[in-house]
């Protein structure tokens, strides 16, 4: 029997073609792009690792040492005004400083505060805060303002919460993504953006594992260095020391990208300042309102913030019934962060190919659908005893509080996993074909204010209820929250469909 050489050659060609397609499917980065891609990924890893550590820490401190209900007050009365102030400062900086220096300045301010909180403020918080007797007397005389009194009496915890809340939207959403948008083409963004999370999002899993083992790390450090600090103080210092180290690595990585990795063409694109006459803050907001494209992006951010906040409040309140100290609560958050990291990597692998093969809309609509479905499930368990009883009858969970915590954790894991990958990447892709001036200043308003307005909008409603009805709890207002949640998710789905049309038109116009 003879073998036809042409058949062998054809088979070999088919095999090579198959492996080539498989390689492109898994790793669509071209050889000359590897260094650029990996350095951006390292920068993203550091920023997100910090983000997850301080997010867990702020909730652990505020929820266990003040109360879960205080979060709604902080988000509206503290975080939202700070977001507006930060936007005003950023627009001024854009018109006066180099983009690279803006990055260094803002990162340094955050890191300086975290260092002060870890080693000066928190160890002395009892001395710096109001006395318990004074607080109790004020709350007794002004019961409707008791949460404001708590907020001000524990001012350092409140300030830490506000600063930590600004990090993901100022550093990650604004500084990092604006930098990446300016050095990435539309064609590169389709391959780069979903895959940025493939390595960087492992920071979620590692942060979760770190927090889960915080007690063991604390014991090791105490024995190793014979420290006399209190258990919870040392836990907070350990977390924030890691934050400081990662922050320094992020600054160094950003410097290397600017001076060693990017070529002159990319450096020219890193001019955040518009070439036209500098715009005032009022003109910047007017530009935002005049752009339907930016308004729709802001709508997505607002809806996401409202939907997530409506579920997180009751969920965190339920969690404090079981996890009563900052270290215990941080370990609990670490456990669901670990699962979030695993599912995020899964979404990264699927998401990069969803964008390339099924298009922008399919990738963008997955997150609101996941949030909607899992959120409805949580509220059903939380509000309707018969539904919770059905779960008890079919699963091993028998504690109603544990059922709510578990369903809420599942909701958070799936929502955050899809948000960190599909939602963030498709949102950033929507900015790429825009005019440079709209991309820069419109993005500042949409990202910072849009995100915070979403969280603060629902926070205002919740805080208003707690002011009017001091005895109200998350359980008693949960049905109301569910109705608002449904309306928000339906609006989110509509805005996604409308933005898809705008995105396609912008790409055609830019080509």
Swiss-Prot record:
Organism (species): Rickettsia conorii (strain ATCC VR-613 / Malish 7)
Domain of life: Bacteria
GO cellular component, as recorded: plasma membrane
Family indicated by similarity: Belongs to the ADP/ATP translocase tlc family.
Membrane topology classification: Multi-pass membrane protein
Protein name: ADP,ATP carrier protein 4
Annotated localization: Cell membrane
Principal cellular location given in the protein's record: membrane
Keywords: ATP-binding, Cell membrane, Membrane, Nucleotide-binding, Transmembrane, Transmembrane helix, Transport
């Amino acid at each position: 029997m003879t073998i036809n050489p042409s058949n062998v050659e054809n088979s070999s060609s088919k095999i090579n073609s198959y492996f080539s397609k498989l390689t492109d499917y898994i790793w669509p980065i071209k050889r000359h792009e590897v260094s650029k891609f990996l350095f951006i990924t390292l920068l993203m890893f550091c920023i997100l690792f910090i983000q997850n550590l301080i997010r867990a820490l702020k909730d652990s401190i505020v929820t266990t040492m003040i109360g879960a209900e205080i979060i709604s007050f902080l988000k509206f009365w503290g975080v939202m005004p700070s977001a507006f102030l930060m936007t005003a400062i950023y627009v001024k900086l854009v018109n006066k400083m180099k983009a690279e220096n803006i990055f260094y300045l803002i990162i340094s301010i955050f890191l300086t505060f975290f260092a002060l909180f870890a080693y000066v403020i928190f160890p002395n918080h009892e001395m710096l805060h109001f006395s318990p007797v004074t607080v109790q007397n004020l709350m007794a005389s002004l019961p409707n303002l008791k949460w404001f009194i708590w907020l001000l009496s524990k001012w350092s915890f409140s300030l830490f919460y506000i600063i930590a809340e600004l990090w993901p939207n100022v550093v990650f959403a604004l500084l990092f993504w604006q930098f990446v948008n300016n050095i990435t083409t539309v064609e590169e963004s389709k391959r780069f953006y979903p895959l940025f999370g493939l390595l960087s999002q492992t920071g979620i899993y590692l942060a979760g594992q770190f927090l889960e083992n915080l007690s063991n790390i604390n014991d090791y450090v105490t024995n190793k260095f014979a420290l006399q600090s209190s258990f919870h103080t040392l836990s907070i210092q350990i977390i924030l020391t890691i934050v400081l180290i990662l922050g320094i690595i992020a600054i160094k990585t950003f410097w290397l990208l600017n001076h060693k990795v990017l070529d002159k063409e990319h450096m020219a694109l890193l001019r955040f300042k518009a070439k036209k006459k500098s715009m005032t803050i009022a003109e910047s907001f007017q530009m935002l309102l005049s752009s339907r494209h930016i308004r729709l992006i802001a709508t997505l951010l607002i809806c996401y913030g409202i939907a997530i906040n409506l579920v997180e409040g009751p969920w965190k309140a339920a969690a404090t019934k079981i996890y009563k100290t900052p270290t215990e609560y941080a370990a609990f958050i670490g456990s669901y962060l670990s699962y979030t990291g695993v599912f995020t990597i899964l979404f990264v692998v699927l998401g990069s190919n969803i964008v390339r093969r099924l298009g922008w809309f399919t990738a963008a609509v997955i997150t609101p659908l996941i949030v909607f479905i899992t959120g409805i499930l949580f509220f059903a368990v939380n509000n309707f005893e018969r539904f919770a009883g059905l779960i008890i009858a079919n699963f091993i969970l028998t504690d109603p509080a544990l059922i709510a915590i578990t369903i809420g954790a599942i909701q958070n894991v799936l929502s955050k996993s899809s948000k960190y990958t599909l939602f963030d990447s498709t949102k950033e892709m929507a900015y790429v074909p825009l005019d440079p001036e709209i991309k820069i200043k419109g993005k500042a308003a949409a990202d910072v204010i849009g995100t915070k307005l979403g969280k603060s909008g629902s926070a205002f409603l919740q805080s208003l209820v707690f002011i009017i009805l001091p005895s109200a709890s998350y359980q008693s207002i949960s049905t109301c929250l569910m109705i608002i949640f449904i309306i928000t998710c339906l609006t989110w789905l509509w805005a996604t469909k409308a933005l898809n049309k705008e995105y396609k038109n912008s790409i055609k116009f830019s080509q």
